[in-house]
Regions:
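Secondary-structure "cap/kink" motif recognition
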Residues: 52-53, 57-65, 200-214
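Hinge/beta->alpha junction and helix N-cap segments in small-molecule ligand-binding domains
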Residues: 196-198
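PLD/PLD-like phosphodiesterase catalytic module centered on the HKD motif
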Residues: 2, 6-22, 28-53, 78-141, ...
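Mature N-terminal segment immediately following signal peptide/propeptide cleavage
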Residues: 40-73
Length: 341
């Protein structure tokens, strides 16, 4: 499935010296960005931790009319200052922060509101507002697996995509307007969006169930039975399934053992102070004409898929696919592997 998406208007170059954290010692040598966008890409792919967050800061600094931010956790003084400066120069800045993470978000809430930025806590209709997006001028949306939380920048594997497809950005903006007002909305999917709690499980299962040769998956969490069953079914029908995830304190020992015993290849990391798999990615059938990749905020848990506000997208751009594949291969090799029965 080829998804026509237009490119980004602001060039995302390498971060300036000292402007953001450098790569963690275990970061791969994969390119920080995927290169020029094509007709099937949602803009440059930014790979963390190597790239840093200067690409996001620059987009904020270039905003002329509006900035809408939806963030699960927000604790980044540079981004906060950039939003305050934008408000001061006449840009309309609005922010939705997750209420359940108030202990993390209260500093940003207080700073931004004191500088005239309109900030609201998330609607209690959703268990968590786990979405991570920044919409610039109603024309571009940064869709992230990462939170704007500086503490985690040096060690977390995360991915950011800049989407300037008009249908996508319009749909994201419409949902933001509703969420900001605590109003009900049925999200539009635009060209290639994946929303929780409306259709994420259905769309992620479709990617997994449609795979014919390979699946490469980053997942911080594992706990949705339907997704696990789909991965097992894929392995049983001959798809090469590899999962790279987290397993701090053995939280997912049972799920990983079940998957490994069914033929799924598992590699994980388990230190909260070292390299951390925070990205949420499903790459299907890399190297084939029908390859595609999901990138977003959704974890493989029933809470994430069925009760949270989440956002991701599915694209088929060759440069994005290639960058994900090379990064995944290195991360998978370095992790701790789960033996099969």
């Amino acid at each position: 499935m080829m998804l026509a998406v237009t490119g980004c208007k602001v060039q995302l170059s390498a971060p300036a010296p000292g402007s953001s954290p450098g790569p963690a010692p275990s970061a791969t040598s994969a390119p920080a960005t995927s290169g020029p966008s094509t007709a099937a890409v949602a803009g440059p792919l930014v790979i963390e931790p190597a790239a840093g967050f200067s690409p996001v800061y620059r987009l904020i600094d270039h905003a002329r009319h509006s900035i809408d931010v939806t963030m699960y956790e927000f604790s980044d003084g540079t981004a906060e200052h950039g939003l305050a400066l934008a408000e001061a120069r006449g840009v309309r800045v609005r922010v939705v922060l997750d209420k359940r993470e108030e202990s993390v978000n209260s500093g940003a809430y207080q700073y931004l509101t004191s500088h005239g930025v309109k900030v609201v806590w998330s609607w209690s209709k959703y268990q968590y507002t786990h979405q991570k997006t920044v919409v610039i001028d109603g024309a571009e949306a940064v869709i992230m697996t990462a939170n704007l939380t500086r503490t985690y920048y040096p060690t977390s594997r995360d991915f950011l995509v800049v989407d300037s497809n008009p249908a996508d950005v319009a749909a994201i903006s419409a949902v933001f307007d509703a969420d900001f007002a605590h109003a009900a909305v049925t999200p539009g999917d635009g060209t290639d969006l994946v929303w929780s709690p409306t259709d994420s499980q259905q769309k992620l299962l479709a990617v997994i169930n449609g795979a014919t040769s390979s699946l490469r998956i980053y997942s911080e969490e594992m706990g949705d039975t339907e997704v696990e069953d789909a991965l097992i079914d894929a392995a049983k029908r001959g798809v090469d399934v590899q999962v790279c995830g987290e397993n701090e304190d053995g939280e997912y020992n049972s799920a990983y053992s079940r998957l490994a015993d069914a033929g799924v290849h598992i590699s994980y990391y388990s230190s909260s102070t070292g390299f951390y798999i925070h990205g949420k990615v499903i790459e299907a059938d890399y190297g084939t004409a029908h390859a595609k990749v999901f990138i977003g905020s959704e974890n493989f848990s029933s809470t994430s898929l069925d009760r949270n506000r989440e956002l991701g997208l599915i694209v088929s751009d060759p440069a994005v696919l290639s960058a994900i594949a090379s990064t995944f291969a290195a991360d998978f090799q370095r992790g701790q592997h789960v033996p099969s029965a």
